[in-house]
A protein has these predicted regions:
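Positively charged n-region of N-terminal signal peptides that target proteins for export
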Residues: 1-4
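Bacterial N-terminal signal peptides
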Residues: 7-16
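Amphipathic/hydrophobic helical signal segments and adjacent flexible N-terminal regions
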Residues: 18-70, 131-133, 142-205
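Disulfide-bonded cysteine motifs in exported proteins
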Residues: 47-48, 77, 106, 122, ...
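Short, hydrophobic/aromatic-rich segments at coil-to-beta transitions
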Residues: 47-54, 85-92, 121-125
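Generic structural hydrophobic/aromatic packing signal, biased to beta-strands
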Residues: 55, 73-75, 94, 138, ...
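N-terminal glycine/threonine-rich, aromatic-flanked beta-hairpin/loop signature
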Residues: 64-113, 188
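Surface-exposed, polar helix/loop patches in the mature regions of secreted/periplasmic/lumenal proteins
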Residues: 98-154
Length: 205
């Protein structure tokens, strides 16, 4: 199921993926969602848009956060028109490497707009992995130059192993609950994409 993106309930994503208090999609007004999309994708999304965020944690940061398991993170957020449903679908792909083990680990799922009632009612994305795989919450910094990813647990897959052998959980510890990842050229996130047509489109953005 690694490469299959299935729509999941927002409530499940919020409770399993990110420890925040949210209101569901129908509590987000259209103007607010549109404004958030423009911030996220650095302009109106159009038919399809990407936002890439990357962080490689340096030795100084890791020394200050000795319990942090993640040494690097890439986050790709996608918006795509679905004309037949008269709506826009949002999805995410997440890639991490760990500081004390080798390999690249990925996850993916669908997102919805949500209102975080515990932080000034800001709009963010609540994103979930299918089959109760947890998820993440994605907000933006005030200057829109970074994304703030929050999690409590999310299912990850080793990119180079069969699905049955590759699944594991990234569980938020003392230093793995909140990650700031910085906006980057979309080509920085190309390794997260497996579809050839989509990869070509991403590289030409």
């Amino acid at each position: 199921m690694k490469q299959t993106l299935l729509v999941v309930a927002l409530a499940a994503a919020a409770s399993a993926g990110a420890a925040v208090t949210v209101q569901a999609e129908d509590g987000v007004d259209k103007a607010g969602a549109t404004a958030f999309d423009i911030r996220m994708f650095a302009g109106p999304p159009g038919a399809k848009a990407y936002a890439c965020f990357v962080r490689r944690y340096d030795a100084n940061h890791l020394a200050q956060h000795p319990k942090q398991k993640v040494s690097a993170m890439k986050l790709l957020v996608t918006a795509e028109d679905a004309p037949e449903d008269k709506t826009t679908n949002y999805s995410f792909r997440l890639g991490v490497t760990y500081r004390h083990r080798s390999g690249n680990f990925d996850s993916s799922g669908f997102c919805n707009h949500a209102i975080a009632t515990d932080s000034g009612h800001e709009i963010r994305f609540e994103c979930g992995v299918d089959c109760e795989g947890g998820g993440i919450s994605v907000a933006l910094s005030k200057d829109d130059k970074s994304a703030i990813a929050r999690l409590s647990s999310i299912r990850m897959w080793n990119r180079n192993k069969p699905d049955d052998d590759a699944s594991e959980e990234l569980i938020a510890g003392a230093d793995d609950k909140i990650f700031r990842v910085d906006r980057a050229d979309t080509r920085e996130c190309a390794e997260l994409v497996t579809d050839r047509k989509e990869l070509a489109a991403l590289r030409h953005k």
